[in-house]
Structure formats: structure tokens, C-alpha cells
């Protein structure tokens, strides 16, 4: 049961407090990185404005950040508010912080591979960001054997594995977590990594194309976050089969459809090949073979998804 003091702090953190009264928040310990702590009124998220990420962080993530900072008051506060301290000892940097985490219920002797696998078993924005915070800039886990994670990374990334390899293992993991966020359309995690790693914008674009995430691809293109040659974009889209959404988007932007057909042939992607041939018929307005399902010049991702969600490739031999 929460103490009266804990309940009072929680209630205060949910209020909109004018700036002239911020000293009260500071006095009550509702202060972090020179900014007031706000708690979401309807969920277990802390609203932050002082880290590289501006937005809502789950209490579990905020707790790991506080542990890595050796901020004992916040460790106690976030734990009292319901944050899970299970992984705390994996990030505690001092003996005192380690002892505090133990008293609050942290698990001893966790293996880094077990942390990685258990958190990513359920791919949510919170778990992806939490995994990132546990491993990133963590002296306790700085010696990583990428063979421990290689099978999982290769299974998820497939062809993109050739673009992720880095001499610094933690850089490889950062790219991997970003890729998972894009692949599974985890908007909160995408926003987190976009704000935290602006030098990985090209990687985000590559992931959106390769994982058929036309919604993120459209956002990147509309906001002009980063630029890539349109035929290179189409090449990436064609490398993974059934990437109809991003192939179509690249086609509408002007990618060479004949070149795309050659790429699908080279990579033996049969469904993509049939789709690219349908797009070529659409471009040439071939009424005999063009699929009535396909419409030209649509860039709205919702309309593209609706148009293609029931698309089935038909072999040219059966036409």
C-alpha cells in the first residue's frame, strides 16, 4: 500500500503547476535534470522535457535512467509509483545504488542475453526503449559478444543485416532496436530513436522501405527528414518479397519500374516480380493486362494500404 506522502507526490505530479510554483515541486522531490516531473494522469508515463527525448517515458524506462544516474531519491520515488526494478542491478554503477536496488526488489545475476531475449519477446515501444536504456552507455554490459545476439538480429533484419554490422557492438544494437521499432510500427519508440539519434535518419528510411512500413516512409518523405535516390529506394523495397506497399510508393515517386523488375528477378522474389509487372502495365495503361485493383499516383499511405491489403499476385503465365 502506498504511503500518504507517496500518494500526495503522485497527485501533485499529475497537476499542471504554474512556473512560479515550481519551487514547490523541487522541494517535494518532483524534479529531474533541472525540470519538473510530470506524471501522466491516465497511464504510467513520466512526461519529460530535459533528456534528448521530449515526450512521455514509461516509468520502467525512467527508473533505469535514474539508476544509471545514481539518483537515489528518484529510484525510490519511481519504484513507489509502480516502476519495475527487476532489471535495476544490471545498470547500478555504485555499491550503494546496487544495495538500494536489491532492497527494492531488483534481481541478482541476470545474464545480458536473458535480458535481451526476455524484453524483446513482446515487442512493444516500452520494451524496445527499456532494452536500449539498459544496454546503452552501461559499463556493466559494455563487453558484448555479438554472437549471443546474432541469430535473433539476423532473423529480424534479413537483408538489412549487411548494413548494420559495426566495429562497435553497441552501435549495432542501437541500429537493431531502431529497426525493430520501424518494423513493428512502434510509433512511440520510433519517435524516441528519431529524437535521440538524428545521425541514423538514413537507417530509419532504409528500415521503413525494407519492412514495408509505408506510413513511416511517407512521414520521412513528407517531412524531408532524409533523402535517398528513388531507384535505390526501389532496389531496397524489391529485396524483400511482398513489399507491395513500399514498392508502389517508390513507383509513384518515379522509380524505374523496368529496373525494379530486374532487381526482383535477381533476388528471385516472385511475388514482387508479378507486382512490378502489374505496375508496368498500369504505367503503360495496358487495358488488356492491367489490374483494375491498382490506381495510379496515390501517395496517402492509408489509401495505399486499403488498395493493396487484398492484393494477390497473379503469375504472368496465368494471364
Swiss-Prot record:
Keywords: Early protein, Host cytoplasm, Host-virus interaction, Inhibition of host innate immune response by virus, Inhibition of host interferon signaling pathway by virus, Inhibition of host STAT1 by virus, Inhibition of host STAT2 by virus, Interferon antiviral system evasion, Viral immunoevasion. Its main location: host cell. One of its GO terms (biological process) is symbiont-mediated suppression of host innate immune response. It comes from the Viruses. The keyword Nucleotidyltransferase does not apply. It is found in: Host cytoplasm. Induction: Expressed in the early phase of the viral replicative cycle. One of its GO terms (cellular component) is host cell cytoplasm. InterPro entries: ASFV_MGF360. Pfam families: ASFV_360. Interacts with host STAT1; this interaction mediates STAT1 degradation through apoptosis. Interacts with host STAT2; this interaction mediates STAT2 degradation through the proteasome. Plays a role in virus cell tropism, and may be required for efficient virus replication in macrophages. In addition, inhibits IFN-beta-induced IFN-stimulated genes (ISGs) transcription. Mechanistically, degrades host STAT1 and STAT2 through apoptosis and ubiquitin-proteasome pathways respectively. Belongs to the asfivirus MGF 360 family. This is Protein MGF 360-9L.
Amino acid at each position: 500500500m502506498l504511503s500518504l506522502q507517496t500518494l500526495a507526490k503522485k497527485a501533485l505530479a499529475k497537476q499542471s503547476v504554474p512556473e512560479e510554483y515550481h519551487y514547490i515541486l523541487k522541494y517535494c522531490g518532483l524534479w529531474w535534470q533541472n525540470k519538473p516531473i510530470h506524471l501522466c494522469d491516465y497511464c504510467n508515463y513520466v512526461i519529460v522535457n530535459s533528456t534528448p527525448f521530449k515526450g512521455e517515458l514509461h516509468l520502467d524506462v525512467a527508473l533505469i535512467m535514474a539508476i544509471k544516474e545514481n539518483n537515489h531519491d528518484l529510484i525510490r520515488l519511481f519504484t513507489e509509483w509502480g516502476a519495475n526494478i527487476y532489471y535495476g542491478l544490471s545498470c547500478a554503477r555504485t555499491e550503494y545504488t546496487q544495495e538500494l536496488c536489491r532492497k527494492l526488489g531488483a534481481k541478482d545475476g541476470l545474464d545480458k542475453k536473458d535480458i535481451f531475449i526476455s524484453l524483446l519477446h513482446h515487442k512493444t515501444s516500452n520494451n524496445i526503449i527499456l532494452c536500449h536504456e539498459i544496454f546503452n552507455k552501461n559499463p556493466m554490459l559494455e563487453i558484448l559478444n555479438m554472437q549471443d545476439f546474432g541469430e535473433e538480429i539476423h532473423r529480424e533484419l534479413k537483408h538489412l543485416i549487411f548494413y548494420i554490422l559495426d566495429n562497435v557492438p553497441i552501435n549495432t544494437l542501437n541500429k537493431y532496436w531502431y529497426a525493430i521499432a520501424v518494423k513493428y510500427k512502434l510509433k512511440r519508440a520510433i519517435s524516441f530513436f528519431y529524437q535521440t539519434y538524428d545521425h541514423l535518419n538514413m537507417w530509419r528510411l532504409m528500415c521503413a522501405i525494407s519492412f514495408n512500413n509505408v506510413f513511416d516512409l511517407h512521414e520521412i518523405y513528407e517531412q524531408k527528414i532524409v533523402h535517398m535516390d528513388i531507384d535505390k529506394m526501389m532496389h531496397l523495397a524489391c529485396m524483400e518479397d511482398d513489399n507491395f506497399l513500399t514498392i508502389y510508393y517508390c513507383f509513384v515517386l518515379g522509380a524505374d519500374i523496368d529496373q525494379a523488375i530486374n532487381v526482383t528477378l535477381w533476388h528471385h522474389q516472385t511475388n514482387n516480380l508479378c507486382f512490378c509487372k502489374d505496375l508496368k502495365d498500369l504505367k503503360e495503361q495496358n487495358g488488356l493486362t492491367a489490374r483494375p485493383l491498382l490506381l495510379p499516383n496515390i501517395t496517402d499511405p492509408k489509401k495505399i494500404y486499403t488498395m493493396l491489403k487484398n492484393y494477390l499476385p497473379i503469375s504472368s503465365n496465368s494471364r
